[in-house]
């Protein structure tokens, strides 16, 4: 009798420790509630991921390191078995959002991604896949909210500021690390050692028909086989996979009021001051996403 009582007690304890079943309707983002014209505030972001962490065994939100704003950097992670300890035998993706908080597309896209992973709308069973995202890298800029510093951009209604709490452009500080943000990024990056790195941005001016473009790190900067994989496998696969989609993707161009050279466009050189240039120093395959600022915010987020 005592044995059965013990087993029953253990089952009750285990059941009480399980997180409740996630209801996606309780995790609608501000982007979705506004029909694609608004982005989440910093407070809404952190609250969203805290609730998602509580609702799903497969999601974890962790404060890691400090930022110049005095608030910590937050990392959100997904693993199908709730194994968040990065290891060599895992396939690891790291996403960076909100380095320029006025370019908020990746912030909202990631909220929906992690919600859909947790609710299994996007079904991933592979226990070796670890997806991590910096919720918002430029916390100080996210808190400095306005509607005027990206006047030529087609939404959202309000957004954060490009400079951080000390007015640094964080996408020029990765190798120099003058800011607490950059030092905390290094802590996150080297603790995960990601195979793939994606940094989400919005373009600043050149006009073209594409909603979304990509900017891969230079393949010839990477070790031979790795560079060949980026150039001959990953980039072509991404372009082909999105070719039949509503949002085809093409290489990023940045020209202002001049005709391109007859030989073609020059590729953006991602020095180590930039995120993908920094991560390529450690043989991580890097890609910067650039959505087009003149396209509607809803399309930009959905394409991301």
Residue ranges and their predicted role:
Residues 17-304:
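Structured catalytic-domain cores with a bias toward divalent-metal coordination
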Residues 1-26:
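Bacterial Sec-dependent N-terminal signal peptides
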């Amino acid at each position: 009798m005592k044995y059965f009582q013990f087993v029953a007690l253990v089952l009750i304890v285990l059941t009480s420790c399980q997180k409740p079943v996630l209801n996606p309707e309780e995790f609608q983002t501000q982007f979705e509630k506004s029909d694609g014209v608004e982005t989440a505030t910093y407070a809404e972001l952190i609250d969203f991921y805290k609730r998602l962490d509580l609702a799903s065994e497969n999601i974890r939100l962790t404060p890691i390191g400090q930022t110049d704003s005095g608030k910590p950097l937050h990392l959100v992670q997904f693993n199908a078995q709730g194994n968040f300890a990065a290891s060599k035998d895992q396939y690891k993706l790291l996403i960076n959002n909100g380095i320029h908080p006025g370019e908020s597309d990746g912030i909202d896209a990631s909220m929906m991604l992690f919600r859909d992973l947790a609710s299994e709308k996007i079904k991933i069973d592979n226990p070796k896949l670890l997806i991590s995202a910096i919720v918002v890298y430029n916390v100080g800029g996210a808190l400095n909210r306005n509607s005027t510093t990206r006047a030529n951009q087609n939404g959202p209604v309000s957004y954060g500021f490009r400079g951080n709490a000390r007015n640094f452009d964080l996408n020029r500080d990765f190798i120099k690390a003058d800011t607490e943000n950059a030092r905390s990024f290094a802590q996150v990056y080297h603790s995960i050692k990601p195979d793939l790195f994606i940094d989400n941005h919005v373009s600043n001016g050149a006009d073209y028909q594409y909603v979304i473009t990509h900017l891969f790190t230079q393949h010839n900067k990477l070790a031979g086989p790795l560079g060949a994989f980026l150039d001959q496998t990953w980039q072509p696969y991404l372009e082909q996979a999105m070719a039949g989609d509503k949002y085809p993707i093409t290489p990023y161009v940045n020209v202002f009021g001049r005709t391109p050279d007859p030989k073609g466009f020059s590729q953006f050189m991602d020095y180590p001051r930039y995120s993908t240039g920094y991560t390529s120093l450690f043989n991580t395959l890097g890609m910067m996403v650039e959505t087009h600022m003149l396209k509607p915010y809803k399309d930009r987020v959905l394409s991301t």
